[in-house]
Amino acid sequence: MKYSVMQLKDFKIKSMDASVRASIREELLSEGFNLSEIELLIHCITNKPDDHSWLNEIIKSRLVPNDKPLWRGVPAETKQVLNQGIDIITFDKVVSASYDKNIALHFASGLEYNTQVIFEFKAPMVFNFQEYAIKALRCKEYNPNFKFPDSHRYRNMELVSDEQEVMIPAGSVFRIADRYEYKKCSTYTIYTLDFEGFNL
């Protein structure tokens, strides 16, 4: 879900209180996260690690049911695979997706991947990255020399809220069910995918 401006401002104000940060940190620790994993969640907001194995272990044990359509802008290397005429796609890394179609359009546009290709799919189980990343930001302790930590925290929470990101584990298998054209500023190709299973 997308958080309101008032909710994010409330998170920011409360996160200025050390006791609130400590309470949220304890909540994450009680859910099985360690401090390094909490930092990894924050790192993933802007840049996923090259090695997804650690991230994959984090999300596999925290999947929740999902019945909503997901959207993903397709990067160039995946577009090349699609051009080979395949029917089955197995993701060998953790896959990010959004509940917001416009986020996928942005990533597929010339502003990011410049592929004009999007996936539309459902995954029965997802990791709610948005929820945990917001919590990780709310409990983050910044270096004392870091300037404007609360503004930085707020901007990152805005980004996480806007992207409405979830993740699915590496080894997720989908079948290409359909393909159609979609026009918005430019013409996009949207592939609809049916979930086949987890090859974990």
UniProtKB/Swiss-Prot annotation:
GO terms for cellular component: virion component. It is found in: Virion. Changing Q164A: No effect on enzymatic activity in vitro. Changing F129A: Complete loss of enzymatic activity in vitro. It comes from the Viruses. NAD(+) binds at R72. One of its GO terms (molecular function) is NAD+-protein-arginine ADP-ribosyltransferase activity. The keyword Glycosyltransferase applies. Transmembrane segments: none annotated. It catalyses: L-arginyl-[protein] + NAD(+) = N(omega)-(ADP-D-ribosyl)-L-arginyl-[protein] + nicotinamide + H(+). Keywords: Glycosyltransferase, Transferase, Virion. The active site is at E165. Changing F127A: Complete loss of enzymatic activity in vitro. Gene3D superfamilies: Toxin ADP-ribosyltransferase, Chain A, domain 1. Its EC number is 2.4.2.31. Changing S109A: Complete loss of enzymatic activity in vitro. Changing R72A: Complete loss of enzymatic activity in vitro. Changing Q116A: No effect on enzymatic activity in vitro. Belongs to the Tevenvirinae NAD--protein ADP-ribosyltransferase modA family. ADP-ribosyltransferase that efficiently ADP-ribosylates both alpha subunits of host RNA polymerase RPOA. The ModA-induced ADP-ribosylation of RPOA alpha subunits inhibits transcription from viral early promoters. This is NAD--protein ADP-ribosyltransferase modA. It comes from Enterobacteria phage T4 (Bacteriophage T4).
